[in-house]
Amino acid sequence: MATKAPEKITKPKDRDFLNHLETYLSKRDGVDKLLKISRYATKIILASSLIPETRSIIPRLKSFESSVGVSRKAFRLGKFVQDINALRSSRWDSNHELVLLIIAYGGEGLYYFVEQFIWLTKSGLIDAKHSKWLQKISAWAELVGYVGSVSIKIRDLRKLNDEESCVASTIEISVSRGLACDGEDEKMKMIKEKKTLKVLSILQDLADGLMTIADIRDGKGVLSAPNVISSAGLFSAIVSTHKNWISC
């Protein structure tokens, strides 16, 4: 799930690529999203007809995909704490905003909390008979979190649109009066970059939400087809990787 914290725009830095990569890989989300890319890229290959079913590599790809899926769950250990802290540090202007924050962070936090037990069932410590109902709770909590997350981000996008209109009006007035507006131009550029990241983040949540609905419906329906879900997962992973890369 995409984190609901505001997207930060940082100015490009002249950084050594390997140093930047080291910083990226030192983060939990950095490694997790690379695993997510490899998993869903593998699922796309398996869902397509690129490799005949009779080839010996198919069982190995299926084993790899399954192992990566279990490995990713280990990265969720304790991750629910970030949602608790995010909710504690949040600010709101109305009860409506507070409800959205509770839905978003509460849903995601419960999802990450339950995922720890799912990992323990996959690892064999907890009896596998508990796996199905734990996965249902996890999926519903995740879906609730996405509803709150998308709602908050749409609200933020509207605020950015209002801010963009205000800055555009200021620039127009400055130009008509023959005044310099370098500061406003830079501000407009920053707003547009924030809007781009916000839109990508919304699309990422929608893609992840589609996969969650497929889990709830046990893979039934046209939108739950393996190639559709795999493509949504890969898109989400690439967006997350991009956001994590530019933020570190």
From Swiss-Prot:
One cellular component GO annotation, for this chain's record? peroxisome
User: According to Swiss-Prot or TrEMBL, what is its membrane topology?
Assistant: Multi-pass membrane protein
> What keywords is this UniProt entry annotated with?
Membrane, Peroxisome, Peroxisome biogenesis, Transmembrane, Transmembrane helix
Explain the induction of this protein.
Up-regulated during senescence.
* Tissues expressing the protein: Expressed in developing siliques.
Tell me where the transmembrane regions lie: 98-118, 221-241
Q: Which residues lie on this side of the membrane: Lumenal?
A: 119-220
Topological domain, Cytoplasmic: which ranges?
Answer: 1-97, 242-248
Q: Name one Pfam family in it.
A: PEX11
Q: Where in the cell is it found?
A: Peroxisome membrane
One term of GO molecular function: identical protein binding
What Gene Ontology biological process does one annotation of this record name? Answer: regulation of peroxisome size
Q: How does it assemble?
A: Homooligomer. Interacts with ARC5 and FIS1B on peroxisomes.
What does the protein in this record do? Involved in peroxisomal proliferation. Promotes peroxisomal duplication, aggregation or elongation without fission.
Q: Which family does it belong to?
A: Belongs to the peroxin-11 family.
Q: What is this protein called?
A: Peroxisomal membrane protein 11A
UniProt organism field: Arabidopsis thaliana
